Amino acid sequence: LRLEVVKNLALDLGHRLEILAGEDTSTDSFIEAALACADLATLAACNLPALPDGEKPLAAAATHLAAGTTRALISLVESETGTLDEAHAENTLKDARSAVWRADLAVRQLVS
């Protein structure tokens, strides 16, 4: 049951990313995508121990890929915040820090 729930969550995250990929490349879209990637990294890292040994390397790779994608998207966001009004830029940067923190936490969980 747990793996079925995880599978459905991963499919939902994939669907969200697919929708975002089709949208304009606004800062908000990049933030949403970064947050979704951070969620995916967390999902993969947290469920790695429950996987059969043969599938653990794939979950670890998924964690690293999702975390790296989060960081790459945040670089794009940070380069665009100068075009936003002050309040929007501040909230965007808070979301960016949250996404990076969550992605980094997921990667650190792999080593513990």
Label the predicted regions.
Residues 1-112:
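Conserved, well-structured ligand/cofactor-binding cores
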